[in-house]
Amino acid sequence: MKFWDLEITFIEKFTVRIFQEISKLNEKFNSWEIDSTTLTNELFKLLILSVNWETDKEKIINLILDMESIEDYSKLNEEIAKRINDSVSNLKKKN
């Protein structure tokens, strides 16, 4: 799936609900109802939901974070939050 400059390829499956939410966000972005920063923030919120629903830690690590190991989900969430901050900062610099 491609939204703005983001390529979403790291989640193998979406629930129907998440897919519907992503479609709504894409429509809002394409109709200028939301800006790129809002789109990015909302997409990352959905990503975090998807990650937290995943039960296979190694799959999460390999698909998203490229981390070698993880001790608990709090570390995972910290890493995701860091990457969100980095991504949003990069998007703001582009704008």
Where are these regions (language model features)?
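Short acidic-hydrophobic surface loop/beta-edge motif
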Residues: 1-6
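Short, surface-exposed, charged amphipathic helix/loop patches that serve as local interaction elements
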Residues: 11-95
